[in-house]
Regions:
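Solvent-exposed loop/turn segments at secondary-structure junctions
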Residues: 53, 70-71, 96-97, 110-111, ...
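Early exported N-terminus immediately downstream of N-terminal targeting peptides
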Residues: 1-76
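Short beta-strand edge/turn micro-motifs at domain boundaries
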Residues: 116-144
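Amphipathic alpha-helical interaction elements
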Residues: 36, 52-53, 81, 151, ...
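Surface-exposed, charged secondary-structure patches
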Residues: 64-66, 74-117, 169-180
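Low-complexity, intrinsically disordered terminal/linker segments enriched in charged
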Residues: 134-180
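Surface-exposed, polar/charged faces of alpha-helical domains
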Residues: 15-22, 26, 55-59, 86, ...
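Charged/polar positions within long, soluble alpha-helices
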Residues: 14, 77-81, 135
Length: 180
């Protein structure tokens, strides 16, 4: 599932590079449709929110999940287009997650002239379909990174305000540790 989805996405990005480069909305729509097929946004959002998710409504969780995904697409969508050559993914193996929460699928992103990059996908079965809820690139967890990044803003402002700021672009999901 992971290798097929990753290969499909990389191939489509390469084939439609000029279209996506001149039409960012088309790129966002494509990535959004792929995320909906393969990614468990709401569960990932609950993990990112951590204790802030307790007592939150499903609507607030969805609001945050969508805002975070939109922010990530705006920030990283064009980066995906700039991958040169013909990258591919190589499956290394899979293992069960603790507590029977799903599986960890270990892969490597292989690019000509570069060392392979380890990428792990944490997946769970949702109504008979395997969905990704966390991605670890070179040992760095997307969920843990964003949980750390958003903890203080969530404590200070709450889910709705942080989601609103993510959606407006005044706050971005990304590697910075201060929420901006």
């Amino acid at each position: 599932v992971v290798i097929d989805a990753s290969t499909r996405i990389l191939t489509t990005l390469q084939q439609r590079r000029s279209e996506f480069g001149s039409n960012p909305a088309s790129l966002r729509n494509y990535i959004d449709s792929e995320l909906n097929r393969t990614f468990d946004r709401d569960y990932a959002a609950r993990l990112v929110l951590g204790p802030h998710a307790r007592g939150a409504s499903d609507a607030d969780i969805k609001l945050f999940a969508d805002a975070m995904a939109d922010s990530l697409m705006q920030r990283y969508g064009s980066t995906l287009l700039n991958i040169q050559g013909k990258p591919s993914f190589r499956l290394k193996g899979e293992s069960p997650l603790p507590g029977n929460r799903g599986v960890r699928v270990s892969t490597e992103l292989v690019r000509a002239g570069s060392e392979p990059t380890p990428v792990e996908y944490w997946m769970r079965n949702v109504n008979g379909q395997w969905k990704i809820f966390d991605v670890n690139i070179e040992g760095i967890s997307y969920v843990q990174t964003f949980r750390n990044q958003f903890d203080t803003p969530l404590r200070q402002k709450g889910i709705k305000q942080v989601a609103s700021e993510l959606h407006s672009g005044s706050m971005q999901a990304g590697p910075a540790g201060n929420g901006k």
